[in-house]
Amino acid sequence: MVRTPKKKISKKVTDLRTRLWPDLSPDDLWHRNVYDGFTSVPRTMPLIMNIIDDLAPGSKRTSMTYLALWGQAFDEMYVSLQNADELAFHSGYTGQRAVRSWKERMRELAKLGFIRIAAGTAGEFSHAVILNPHFAIRRLHAAGTPGLTAAAYNALVERGIAIGAEDMNVALPEERQEEAEAAK
């Protein structure tokens, strides 16, 4: 499969944008290579968020907690949870039960396999690591987890293939470990 170079794609998109919005100044756009304060997120994030909310019990907006964690993470996917009040607010929770609601969502994300939490000086919720969401969803699908519909999973797979998300096709870490042990 021959891929079009990114520069060529970028030029095509820039040319189209200029034709559609000739009065638009490039200074009005967000440039991740110019401004600080950005993070990389999977292009499948909207689908991931929908799946998380489908899997979370009740009408919880667990996906907003997940997105807030991504907003705090760097490439190491580690998040300090030292300021629970702030993280709860960023997740959309206010009032007396804000931190409690946030902690419930954090537990749900950990239970579903999207994050891992570690205790420390701030108590039970001191540190978090964000796991590969595609792997988490693939595991949930393989386990037949209620709430993960075929339509949602297939949409994620389709989008993953369309954007070249190799982690939708490669063996999961535990599968690679089993293969390595079997080869011994």
Q: What is the meaning of each model-derived region?
A:
Residues L55, Q72-A128:
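Winged helix-turn-helix DNA-binding recognition segment
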Residues S25, I117-G120, S126-R139:
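Short, cationic/aromatic linear interface patches
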Residues N169-K184:
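Eukaryotic intrinsically disordered, low-complexity regulatory regions
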Residues P133-L172:
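Short, amphipathic alpha-helical interaction segments positioned at domain boundaries
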